Amino acid sequence: DFKVAAFHGHAWPNPAVMTADAIIMAHNHPTVMLDTPLGVKITRPAWVRGKPDIERLAAAFLNQDNVRLKEEEEPLSIFEEEYGFECGSPEIIVMPTFNDILGGLPVNSEAPESLLGPLFRKKLVDMDTFDAYMLDGTFMGSIGFLRDRLEGRV
């Protein structure tokens, strides 16, 4: 069975989301900023998806609940002991806004820690390794590639 967990993204989710195969979150309204041949920058809503560092995420959940890890302790083992279930390896999917009136955060031009919510503010997700897709499903590339392209490095 494929398990999906969803949460808004503005606050810490329940640790049980880590048992899902996919975690769907919102709150950031991700967009991708593109540079046109005329030098005009435009932004478009985008889906963002990727795999987090599970050990760092497990350690962060424990830290959030005031469980301090000793240097030799494995975060995944302690996570299972503390919460009573095994931490999976979920993919994170960040939903765009579907309302043209609402703005968004250009994930390829914002500093990753300026994104909203604890998973991003605490740098638990390496956004540059995540992929961006337009609303119609068109694959745009990794956020890191899109950042390099916007900054003229590609």
Which residue stretches match the model-derived regions?
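Extended recognition/assembly regions associated with phosphoester-bond processing machinery
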Residues: 1-154
